[in-house]
Amino acid sequence: MQTEHVILLNAQGVPTGTLEKYAAHTADTLLHLAFSSWLFNAKGQLLVTRRALSKKAWPGVWTNSVCGHPQLGESNAEAVIRRCRYELGVEITPPESIYPGFRYRATDPNGIVENEVCPVFAALTTSALQINDDEVMDYQWCDLAAVLRGIDATPWAFSPWMVMQATNREARKRLSAFTQLK
């Protein structure tokens, strides 16, 4: 895969430039555009993934299905589809927006900061997974209600963005409704 960049944003969310993805994520990460996606199978189960140990931020942490950064000239939906193919080897239905205004800043135990405007999407998988081990070290198909109970009981066991997304009342409602689309 070619070198990815992040789209830098000002405080109002207006693009101001780009920076190579690896260089962008430091102890003083600039605000940039990202996306987060929750994938469900035909049984209505949520795909929860464990980030590869080689990841710069939050290695080995359980999180929602797939996250990434749109590239210059790429729509969020195109970025979600691209990362699903790259990380999970899976085809999906058109991504649906479930939390368009999500923005967060969090610091991992190694001091790496995520500072993102990060719209959240959900989609159904339409093919079998072919996991890229460079991105994902483990995965499980889970009942959404069980995952949400786990997040409520042990938020430290999941990525901070997953916890923040799942504890937003409207996003939780939309995710729950999404499980009924099967």
UniProtKB/Swiss-Prot annotation:
Pathway: Isoprenoid biosynthesis; dimethylallyl diphosphate biosynthesis; dimethylallyl diphosphate from isopentenyl diphosphate: step 1/1
Catalytic-site annotation from UniProt: 67, 116
Cell location: Cytoplasm
Signal peptide: none
PROSITE patterns: NUDIX
GO terms (BP aspect): dimethylallyl diphosphate biosynthetic process; isoprenoid biosynthetic process
Keyword terms: Cytoplasm, Isomerase, Isoprene biosynthesis, Magnesium, Manganese, Metal-binding
GO CC terms, sorted: cytoplasm
Reactions mediated catalytically: isopentenyl diphosphate = dimethylallyl diphosphate
Cofactor(s) it depends on: Mg(2+); Mn(2+)
Coiled coil: none
Listed CDD domains: NUDIX_IPP_Isomerase (cd02885)
Annotated binding of Mn(2+), by residue: 25, 32, 69, 114, 116
GO molecular function: isopentenyl-diphosphate delta-isomerase activity; metal ion binding
Family: Belongs to the IPP isomerase type 1 family.
Subunit structure, as described in the record: Homodimer.
Record's protein name: Isopentenyl-diphosphate Delta-isomerase
Species this protein is from: Escherichia coli O127:H6 (strain E2348/69 / EPEC)
GN (gene name): idi
